[in-house]
Amino acid sequence: MNKANQIGGLVIGTGDLSEVALGWSTYNGDHMSMYAVNVSVPKTLVRYLVDYVSSLYKGQVLETILQDVLDTPVSPELLPQEDDKIVQKTEDIVGPYELHDFFIYHMVRFGDEPRKLYKKTKLAFKDKYDKDTIKKMVTFILLAFL
């Protein structure tokens, strides 16, 4: 940030709406950026768009690169561990982003309360998530907003 100020530049952050809503920002990374270009875009939409762009480049190098990005678990780690595996997977800690993004949308857009969120989630995701997981994730997102 000091360097950006010295040369009249900006520190661009890559954090998205999902991370900001959950308070899951990297300190002195996304958290300290001067301009967050993705802050109004949920993580599930980012992934969808990357997948869409990838589909436009079938059989080309860009498709392989973008699919590798999609296949890599979401993680704040910038480098792999010694055995080339990512140890800290964000969704193992905060839960599925597709649920959080669903909750954020329905809470902000429609003002849904926990009971209604639960019912809509059961309808939207059918049997993908069990009752306890949904309740746990609804509680998690509500605590993030308190």
Regions found by a protein language model. Give the residues of each.
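ATP/NTP-dependent adenylation/nucleotidyl-transfer catalytic domains that generate, transfer
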Residues: M1-L146
